[in-house]
């Protein structure tokens, strides 16, 4: 059961699937029930007088928890970017958070998108009706504008046909073209060949990389082209804003049917890693405290951030994850209500 505009898991489509028509007033509630069933271990129906009762069974055992890092290899990789501090590990939590709501949000706002893995997950998996994501960095924004605004095939072809050598890479990275398409390609190349995916200007090129492949160790042209094309094929589910995430939050803060995911440039190493790194964190907490809709933040696990969360009465929880060097560490999830968290 789904409306024609709704995306649902492919596993729901089988020879046993029956298509039914229901009044619009029932559609959202029925879709919510279906998603709840899909994320639980099972269900049973029983009759009581003139009432049909649906009982959800115990939730399936999940492969993550507050002290058990997510195996990121089990999570779909959808972004063309690789980021230090990327949020692929957070995807199962995002699913649980958005599915825990009684009604699906009208929109999800990701105010500091970067590689936008949360936005892409929500859009691809139909976790919200629409996704709006925002990025202040002009070079990263150039990529998203190209991917979503009709020139994705040019970028995919450029990546597929590029002869990656150190000399060719340096020529592109030292280029000064202000044309949007060229800036987008230069940004993708920079992200893929500079050490650690660091986006700040001046970072060195990869030297050894995977299996001694050097500069080619993170350059997978077929994969990058496929991801870009797949995102473009679903472009109607996304809106991209180049600008300040604070402005986007303010624009939608009075809407109770908007959910906000916030992953700002972190307080520890942001200046070294990113070009758009300077964020007023107290102002961010203040602005979210005024939002009518739900929100989820991911943050450094630091004394300063904990103090901010406590001062605004937000709940917080340390979540196990692994960094790019596979070292186990924790980050904070912060929200008004974290009772949906498992483990």
Question: Which residues fall in each region the model found?
Answer:
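S-adenosyl-L-methionine
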Residues: 7, 12-16, 35-112, 117-118, ...
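SAM-dependent nucleic-acid methyltransferase catalytic core
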Residues: 3, 67-98, 102-103, 141, ...
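Short amphipathic alpha-helix starts
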Residues: 18-27
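Long, positively charged, glycine-interspersed low-complexity recognition regions
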Residues: 16-18, 267, 274-343
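Short active-site oxyanion
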Residues: 18, 104-108, 128-130, 235-239, ...
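Conserved S-adenosyl-L-methionine
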Residues: 23, 104-164, 263
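A short, Lys/Arg-enriched interface patch at domain edges and termini
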Residues: 27-44, 338-343
């Amino acid at each position: 059961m789904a409306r024609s505009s709704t995306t649902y898991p492919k596993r729901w489509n089988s020879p046993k699937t029956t298509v039914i028509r229901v009044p619009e007033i029932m559609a959202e509630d029925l879709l919510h029930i279906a998603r709840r069933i899909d994320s639980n271990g099972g269900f049973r129906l029983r009759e009581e007088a003139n009432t049909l009762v649906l009982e959800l069974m115990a939730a399936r055992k999940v492969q993550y928890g507050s002290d058990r890092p997510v195996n990121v290899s089990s999570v779909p990789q959808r972004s063309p970017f690789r980021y230090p501090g990327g949020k692929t590990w957070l995807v199962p939590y995002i699913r649980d958070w958005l599915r825990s709501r009684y009604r699906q949000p009208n929109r999800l706002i990701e105010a500091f998108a970067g590689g936008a893995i949360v936005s892409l997950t929500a859009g691809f998996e139909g976790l919200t009706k629409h996704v709006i994501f925002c990025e202040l960095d002009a070079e990263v924004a150039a990529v998203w504008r190209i991917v979503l605004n009709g020139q994705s095939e040019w970028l995919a072809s450029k990546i597929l046909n590029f002869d990656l050598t150190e000399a060719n890479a340096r020529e592109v990275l030292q280029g000064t073209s202000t044309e949007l398409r060229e800036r987008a390609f230069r940004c993708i190349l920079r992200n893929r060949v500079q050490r650690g995916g660091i986006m700040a200007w001046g970072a060195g090129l990869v030297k050894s990389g995977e299996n001694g492949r050097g500069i080619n160790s993170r350059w997978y042209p077929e994969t990058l082209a496929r991801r870009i094309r797949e995102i473009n094929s679903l472009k109607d589910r996304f809106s991209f804003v180049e600008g300040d995430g604070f402005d986007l939050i303010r624009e939608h803060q009075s809407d109770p049917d908007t959910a906000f995911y916030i992953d700002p440039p972190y307080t520890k190493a942001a200046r070294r890693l990113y070009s758009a790194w300077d964020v007023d964190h107290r102002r961010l907490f203040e602005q979210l405290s005024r939002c009518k809709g739900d929100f989820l933040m991911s943050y450094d696990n630091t004394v300063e951030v904990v103090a901010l969360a406590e001062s605004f009465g937000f709940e917080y929880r340390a979540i196990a994850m692994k960094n790019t060097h596979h070292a186990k560490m924790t980050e904070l999830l912060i929200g008004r209500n974290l009772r949906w968290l498992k483990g």
